């Protein structure tokens, strides 16, 4: 009777990792909360809102028109929201955490939706009043139409940076809801 002898194959020792393995996050798209793209959008929103606010406040007679006061209020709100969410994004990136909790994603979606809508409405109102002053009343000589136009343009750019943040957060929140 012939019995086979088991062959012993030595197993190599796995290499020691000096760094943690790279994490793979399949559902993080750039622009969503907690990503570098999301942080870039937040900083863009913040920068353009601060510019719009600064330009509008630098004109001495902005407080006489309700639409201009509304733009100032909307840009202050946009600045506060963008600052807070940028800090949250920086924290999430620094500790390598994803922001996929449905309550947090819902808060981002609602906050982005409200602030982007307010900023867009304020920019439209400011642009409309500026067109009225410039084209219809022909009183740009005694008003600061250039500053008003620049403030409206910066508010539109802030809204353009806020819209993708809202759409991605809303889409992500919609994917988290389970329908029965």
Swiss-Prot record:
Cysteine pairings via disulfide bonds: none
Membrane topology: Multi-pass membrane protein
A GO cellular component annotation in the UniProt record: plasma membrane
tRNA processing as UniProt keyword: no
Cytoplasmic side: 1-36, 89-102, 172-180
Location within or outside the cell: Cell membrane
Any matching Pfam family: CASP_dom
Membrane-traversing stretches: 37-57, 68-88, 103-123, 151-171
InterPro entries reported in the protein's UniProt record: CASP_dom, CASPL-5
Keywords: Cell membrane, Membrane, Transmembrane, Transmembrane helix
Coiled coil: none
Segments on the Extracellular side according to the record's topology features: 58-67, 124-150
Family: Belongs to the Casparian strip membrane proteins (CASP) family.
Subunit structure, as described in the record: Homodimer and heterodimers.
Protein name per the record: CASP-like protein 5A1
Provenance organism: Pteridium aquilinum subsp. aquilinum (Bracken fern)
